[in-house]
């Protein structure tokens, strides 16, 4: 079976559906790959690189399976009967294309119709592209912004950090929060789902909650329209933040519907001159009033509104690699025997949800898939408290007295040469107990390095005793070497793992 990789005819599309790395992975599944000449040129993948990876440079329309980024509307007539077309077909917003595909004896799978379930995460193109878009949105904002993101104290004065507001904490929003925070900005984020608050805080952002009485949970994995009460409360929050922040990044999208308006023209008018807004929903109408899809607009009060619709395509090499990997994961699912034979199983909810047309038969829309329905709250059962017997702690003075008496008796019975060692040993125990007991728990792992050195001394001392005494001395020396060696090697292993947490691979 042959897989063909199309070159997108749109001059603004720089991505490609396969890279040399993914071509090698497809070959391991038993497929032959044909790449259209120049398909990866805009993403820095030459035809020679594809050929070295095992692909053939030729006509992809004669292949059994055709990979594409966007639907090849002008080339559908050239697809052979029985061809399987796989790409971002956007069936929710392109009913005309769906009808056109259904009139042809082909099978069409849409990569942007993958259900939001954990088993399908490796195929989720929307998440892959949203991750790139969120990162690129911060890069575009930094390019248009006239100041540092991070605060600085210099000889010329103090530079305040930039304040960034991210509307929506989905995949794109979280990527934007992480990128802006890594540049040193003060990041705030809003989202109608209160459960994402911990994710925002884990990336160093501040979660701004919209206090509303009717926050609902979507059962599809995608955003949903909110109530008028929520929208009114959110509008007041956005209005307050617009006067304060320097950069706003909006990510709110509702599948199959125009993007909701979050930032009005009045809010934009209150923003400071030089502020930047990146509207990531510009392709669907925009979250910001005044956004022009594909263009940059500067308002009368000096606010820059960026409405780029190709943010993932502005990182073409990375976007192509992630998209190609999503396709490879799909082919692994469709090729269970790794024999180069595509098997489409409609009993699999993932494959069923992606299939728009099967052998010329319309299969869109698929049955709904519930992926995140909130479980019903269970009333807590009353638990009868059973009294636990209280153990009286030992008297510290009694314990100290017994220990002192035992030490005194041991010292009195010991040889004179041993008394000094016992005294030092007892003092070391007391001092070590109080020193280690007051060390913060987070520093216990670094203390392993110190204990390695102490255990090493024990090993050396035990080695010196081997062969210089009776069987008892030799036996105790062997036990000491064994136990101390476990501490030494274990300590170094833990220390290595600890240091690896602070290094970049």
Predicted feature residues:
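ADP-ribose/adenylate-binding Rossmann-like module
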Residues: 81-112, 247-306
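Small-residue-rich segments of transmembrane alpha-helices in multi-pass membrane proteins
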Residues: 453-463
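A structured beta-alpha segment of the ubiquitous adenosine-cofactor-binding alpha/beta core
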Residues: 54-62, 71, 217-248, 252-265, ...
């Amino acid at each position: 079976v042959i897989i063909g990789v199309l070159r997108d005819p749109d001059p603004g599309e720089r991505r490609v559906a396969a890279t040399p790395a993914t071509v090698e992975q497809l070959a391991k599944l038993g497929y032959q790959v044909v790449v259209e000449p120049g398909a990866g040129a805009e993403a820095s993948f030459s035809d020679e690189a594809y050929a070295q990876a095992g692909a053939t440079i030729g006509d992809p329309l004669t292949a059994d399976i055709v990979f594409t980024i966007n639907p090849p509307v002008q080339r559908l007539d050239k697809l052979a009967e029985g061809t399987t077309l796989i790409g971002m077909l956007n069936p929710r917003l392109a009913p005309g294309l769906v009808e056109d595909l259904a009139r042809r004896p082909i099978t069409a799978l849409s990569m942007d119709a993958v259900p939001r379930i954990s088993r399908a995460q490796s195929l989720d193109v929307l998440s892959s592209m949203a991750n790139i878009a969120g990162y690129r949105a911060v890069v575009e904002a930094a390019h248009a912004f006239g100041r540092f993101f991070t605060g600085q104290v210099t000889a010329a004065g103090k530079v305040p950090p930039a304040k960034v507001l991210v509307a929506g904490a989905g995949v794109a929003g979280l990527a934007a929060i992480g990128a802006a925070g890594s540049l040193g900005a003060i990041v705030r984020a809003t989202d109608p789902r209160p459960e994402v608050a911990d994710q925002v805080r884990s990336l160093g952002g501040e979660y701004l909650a919209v206090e509303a009485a009717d926050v609902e949970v979507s059962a599809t994995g995608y955003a949903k329209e909110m109530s008028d009460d929520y929208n009114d409360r959110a509008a007041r929050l956005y209005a307050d933040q617009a006067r304060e922040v320097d950069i706003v990044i909006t990510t709110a999208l509702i599948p199959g519907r125009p993007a909701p308006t979050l930032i009005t023209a009045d809010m934009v008018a209150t923003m400071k001159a030089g502020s930047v807004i990146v509207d990531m929903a510009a392709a669907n109408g925009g979250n910001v009033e005044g956004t022009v899809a594909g263009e940059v607009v500067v308002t009368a009060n000096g606010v820059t509104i960026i409405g780029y619709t190709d943010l993932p395509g502005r990182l073409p090499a990375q976007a192509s690699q992630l998209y190609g990997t999503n396709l490879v994961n799909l082919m692994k699912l469709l090729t269970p025997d790794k024999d180069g034979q595509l098997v489409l199983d409609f009993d699999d909810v993932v494959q069923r949800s992606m299939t728009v047309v099967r052998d010329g038969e319309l299969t869109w829309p698929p049955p709904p898939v519930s992926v995140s329905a909130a479980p019903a709250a269970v009333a807590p059962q009353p638990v009868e408290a059973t009294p636990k017997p209280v153990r009286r702690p030992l008297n510290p003075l009694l314990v100290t007295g017994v220990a002192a008496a035992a030490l005194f008796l041991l010292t009195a019975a010991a040889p004179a040469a041993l008394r000094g060692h016992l005294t030092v040993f007892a003092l070391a125990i007391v001092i070590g107990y109080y020193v280690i007991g007051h060390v913060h728990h987070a520093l216990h792992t670094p203390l392993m390095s110190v204990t390695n050195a102490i255990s090493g001394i024990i090993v050396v001392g035990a080695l010196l005793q081997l062969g210089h005494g009776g069987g008892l001395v030799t036996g105790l020396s062997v036990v000491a070497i064994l136990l101390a060696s476990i501490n030494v090697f274990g300590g170094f292993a833990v220390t290595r793992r600890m240091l690896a947490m602070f290094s970049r691979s």
